[in-house]
Swiss-Prot record:
Functional description taken from the UniProt entry: Needed for flagellar regrowth and assembly.
Species name: Salmonella typhimurium (strain LT2 / SGSC1412 / ATCC 700720)
PANTHER family in the record: FLAGELLAR ASSEMBLY PROTEIN FLIH, YOP PROTEINS TRANSLOCATION PROTEIN L
Subcellular location: Cytoplasm
Protein name in the entry: Flagellar assembly protein FliH
Region (Disordered) location: 1-22
Family classification: Belongs to the FliH family.
InterPro entries per the UniProt record, alphabetical: Flag_FliH, Flagellar_FliH/T3SS_HrpE, T3SS_Stator/FliH
Gene name of the encoded protein: fliH
One term under GO cellular component: cytosol
Top-level taxon of origin: Bacteria
One Pfam family in the UniProt entry: FliH
Entry's Gene Ontology BP terms: bacterial-type flagellum organization; bacterial-type flagellum-dependent cell motility; protein transport
Gene Ontology molecular function: any one: cytoskeletal motor activity
Lineage of origin: Bacteria, Pseudomonadati, Pseudomonadota, Gammaproteobacteria, Enterobacterales
Length: 235
């Protein structure tokens, strides 16, 4: 059997469908190129797009305006707070620096016032002394002296009789002796006082001598007392 086929191994047929060949589908009458213009929008779409852009712009403007205003307000507030704080610190520092100066000025004013008060007292005392000295000069040069003051002085001494014991002796200037005798002789005798003339006394003065001591009412003594009262600490 020479015409017989050679021996081959049997294999089953492939049951999978045959692969399809991809053929690009071309759109009918449509050619896409880079220069192809975009499709035109309708009026409604254009309006919506413009509104969206306006909203975006308004949002950006509002944000920028708010940011600028916030910065400005913050700057102004910071400036005012800094100014107030600086002013307060400056005032406190100025008060601290001026406190010693103010205290020194108060001390100077007080010392100046005390000086004026002392000067006023000295001036018044000096004027009083000058007036008393002028009066003494006038009285010393006057030939006639009014004895009314001496009479009143002796009457006051008589009212102080309980201060004297025994028989007090009243001495006056010899030129005043007659006037005192005429005015108070009887009263002096009634009280047991003795009247004597003393040339060492000035006109208008008198002295009372008793067991307890002397009471000096002479012009010289009264003059010294007036000067002492007019200028305390000087005499």
């Amino acid at each position: 059997m020479s015409n017989e086929l050679p021996w081959q191994v049997w294999t089953p047929d492939d049951l999978a469908p045959p692969p399809e060949t991809f053929v690009p589908v071309e759109a009918d009458n449509v050619t896409l190129t880079e220069d192809t213009p975009e499709p035109e929008l309708t009026a409604e779409q254009q309006l919506e797009q413009e509104l969206a852009q306006l909203k975006i712009q308004a949002h950006e403007q509002g944000y920028n305006a708010g940011l600028a205003e916030g910065r400005q307000k913050g700057h102004a507030q910071g400036y005012q707070e800094g100014l107030a704080q600086g002013l307060e610190q400056g005032q406190a520092q100025a008060q601290t620096q001026q406190a010693p100066i103010h205290a020194r000025m108060q001390q100077l004013v007080s010392e100046f016032q005390n000086t004026l008060d002392a000067l006023d007292s000295v001036i018044a005392s000096r004027l009083m002394q000058m007036a008393l000295e002028a009066a003494r000069q006038v009285i010393g040069q006057t030939p006639a002296v009014d004895n009314s003051a001496l009479i009143k002085q002796i009457q006051q001494l008589l009212q102080q009789e309980p201060l004297f014991s025994g028989k007090p002796q009243l001495r006056v200037h010899p030129d005043d002796l007659q006037r005192v005798e005429e005015m108070l002789g009887a009263t002096l005798s009634l009280h047991g006082w003795r009247l004597r003339g003393d040339p060492t006394l000035h006109h208008g003065g008198c002295k009372v001598s008793a067991d307890e001591g002397d009471l000096d009412a002479s012009v010289a003594t009264r003059w010294q007392e007036l000067c002492r009262l007019a200028a305390p600490g000087v005499l």
